[in-house]
Amino acid sequence: MSRATKLKVEDAPAEDTAWAGIPSLSLQQLWFSIQRREWSSLVAVPADRDMPVMDFVKPLYDVGRLAMGDNLRLVDAREVKLTRTAPLIVEMTGAVRGPGSKGGERVLVVIDSVLSHPSGVPVALAADAALLCVEMGKTSLTAARETLQIVGAQRFLGCITLPRP
């Protein structure tokens, strides 16, 4: 018989119970589900203008850091100017790896809405994959569809939603 520790379902923290330092079960599931796909750069794309995209990305990044440690970086590309997109793309895709850079590193990139900041389009297109960020009850279906069309629906691994405030 195995000596492995057994965990009963009732011993696990509930989804809505605050368990200090541990992200929600749904975020953990999202993180591990996107790990099944191959990517080294993943961009979070707000589906509409003026969205608090960091409210979506920071908790997901926290889960990723717990799982991957220093092998995950967060790149804040909000308000990036078109003249700065090329160096940013080089940084996020790892085209220029300096001495001491690690293999297996992944980058989570945050951009502003491509509807209000077109300079985010080349960044989104350069990433291996994307996640669509949607605020429930606030994001318009038209804006979400337009965002999918601009970036390319096939690039998206899924969608992160925030409930109504």
Functional labels for PLM-detected ranges:
Residues 1-165:
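P-loop NTP-binding module
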